Amino acid sequence: MGDRANFGLRQNDGNIIFVYGHWAGAGMLAKFANALDYVQDAGRIDDQAYANRIIISQLVGEEWNGTLGWGVTVNYLADNEHKVPVFDFATREVTLYEADWKSGVLTDSIVTFSLNEFIRKYAKTLVGV
């Protein structure tokens, strides 16, 4: 039950913060691209502490007060049903990985994009009403 996905933020020291979304799989690459686009447009992509918080906030959205649905881990994947996109602050690249969620680790890299390539390919225009 669910559509489990993880999003990775590789820190300058090599550690990876993973954001787990229990129902985040549908449109996950667009969600991640929109979050990265937002933080880049805000001028905070080079400020890792702020960028981490902004990206996580964009992914979680209005669900902050809930007790289910989202989690955060460091260097360990939570339950997962999809490929895992990881943004690397040092290289400004997004790599899509295979993952072994039973072991909690990333395995093979599939494809790597520059930050702007990833945003152009996957970001969706969001219209507020």
Language-model features, listed with the residues they occupy:
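Short beta-strand scaffold segments in enzyme catalytic cores
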Residues: R4-L9
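Short acidic-glycine loop/turn motifs at beta-strand connectors
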Residues: R10-N15, F89-T91
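Short, flexible N-terminal segments of the mature chain
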Residues: N15-A51
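Low-complexity intrinsically disordered segments
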Residues: L36-V129
